Curated annotation (Swiss-Prot):
PANTHER family: OS08G0374000 PROTEIN-RELATED, STRESS-INDUCED PROTEIN SAM22. One of its GO terms (biological process) is response to wounding. Gene3D superfamilies: 3.30.530.20. This is Dau c 1 isoallergen Dau c 1.0301. Coiled coil: none annotated. Melting temperature is 57.7 and 80.3 degrees Celsius at pH 7 and pH 3, respectively. Not heat stable, unfolds at 95 degrees Celsius at pH 3. Refolds partially at physiological pH 7, but not at pH 3, after being heated to 95 degrees Celsius and cooled down back to 25 degrees Celsius. The keyword Acetylation does not apply. The lineage of its organism: Eukaryota, Viridiplantae, Streptophyta, Embryophyta, Tracheophyta. GO terms for molecular function: abscisic acid binding; protein phosphatase inhibitor activity; signaling receptor activity. GO terms for cellular component: cytoplasm; nucleus. Induction: Up-regulated by abiotic stress (wounding) in transgenic Dau c 1.01 or Dau c 1.02 gene-silenced carrot roots, and to a lesser extent in wild-type roots. Up-regulated slightly in transgenic Dau c 1.01 or Dau c 1.02 gene-silenced carrot roots in response to biotic stress (infection with A.radicina). It comes from Daucus carota (Wild carrot).
Length: 154
């Protein structure tokens, strides 16, 4: 099994607590308003805490149409979440799972920095192509910025 690690940081003027709430705890209510059409459908099994499963269907026409996420850890006071992508065509047939750790850290100016670490567990010696990682990073940034704009406006 191969392992690849990718890190991403995005800064915001939105305070850490508000960003974590909007980006993680209330994302299923905010995202349809902030980025209509980003998801086609979301089926949730669980209360949002550890063990919750989300099956996400994305719009047709993109390189990825399905993914299933499992919440592995959640610290509401520390503004962190651990979740894994465990199924769907997002795994491209050569990834076993993607472990993600996301933390929202307060900054000195009252804003926040969202830090994400993704660990790709690949089958055999498969390697996730850099263009796939860049595409995922661009999608994450787009959704983050949509949520950020929504939080600033509301």
């Amino acid at each position: 099994m191969g392992v690849q690690k990718h890190e991403q940081e995005i800064t915001s003027s939105v305070p850490a607590e508000k960003m974590f709430h909007g980006l993680i705890l209330d994302i299923d209510n905010i995202l349809p308003k902030a980025a209509p059409g980003a998801y086609k459908n979301v089926e949730i099994k669980g209360d949002g805490g550890v063990g919750t499963i989300k099956h996400i269907t994305l719009p047709d026409g993109g390189p990825v149409t399905t993914m299933t996420l499992r919440t592995d850890g959640l610290d509401k006071k520390g503004f962190t979440i651990d979740y894994s992508v465990i199924d769907g065509d997002v795994l491209m047939g050569f990834i076993d799972k993607i472990e993600n750790h996301l933390s929202v850290v307060p900054t000195a100016d009252g804003g926040s920095t969202t830090k994400t670490t993704a660990i790709f567990h690949t089958k055999g010696d498969a390697v996730v192509p850099e263009e796939n990682i860049k595409y995922a990073e661009a999608q994450n940034t787009m959704l983050f910025k949509a949520v950020e704009a929504y939080l600033i406006a509301n």
